[in-house]
Amino acid sequence: DVDRSRGLGDVYKRQAMRCSIYSCERSMAVMEEFARAEIPKGGVTEDDVWAVLHAENIKRGGEWIETRLLTSGPRTNPWFQECGPRIISENEILAFDTDLIGPYGICADLSRTWWIGDSLAPANMRESYAEAVEHIRYNTRLLKPGLHMEDLTHSLHVLQDKYQALKYSSPMHGVGMCDEWPLIAYPDRLVKNAFDAVLEPGLTLCVEALVGEVNGDHMVKLEDQGVVTNNGYETISTYPLDERLFSN
């Protein structure tokens, strides 16, 4: 059907997606450079930082950004608050989800969380970040052609109890010209037979995590994008993790 076809696409779509992701990550790098250089000077707002991503996307032939999901400090929790005029301080957390329509009209849907400061982030934030990294890495290792989507749901990494209430709406979703078919649900949100299909080579998927506690002082948002291959899954996005929050 149309949804499945959009999710799978063809070799040309996947080539365009690689271009869009590359462009997005170069734009993210400029945004990070701006944030780390300018926030410590004072007076830089969430909107100021987000505007850099917009400008860099347009410079590289991109089209638009669907959301305003960049927040800082305590405004990261709960997630889904839009960026605004809040001034970001040094030694604060900053998290974002690009939701970016880049070159060729293809979505680059990546998320990163940064600690804006020279020292290590606080221990509770590093714990959340490590949990988010493990969630994505574990779930990515599950991906292979022929795996039924409901079986995938029941095989997912389980977040710690304290992170369950605020976990993301889904750990994986299709991606193309925007968020696409399918949606891989968590077990407690599974609608039986809603996605009665198996993973196929060429299916483009985002794998993500949202980690934080109810009434906590932060949320960590991470998301990568890639494609199911003939023998597994290739993560196309390569933007580095923040070593102030995590080290391998």
Labelled PLM ranges:
Residues 1-12:
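Single conserved hydrophobic/aromatic residue that forms the stacking wall/gate
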Residues 10, 34-46, 142-149:
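Conserved short loop/turn motifs at secondary-structure junctions
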Residues 13-25:
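Amphipathic alpha-helical segments
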Residues 14, 33, 40-123, 175-194:
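Short catalytic-site patches enriched in acidic/histidine residues
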Residues 22-36, 54-62, 137, 141, ...:
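Generic secondary-structure signature for well-ordered alpha-helical cores
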Residues 43, 62-68, 107, 146-151, ...:
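Flexible, glycine/charged-enriched surface loops at secondary-structure junctions
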Residues 128-169:
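Extended C-terminal subregions enriched in glycine
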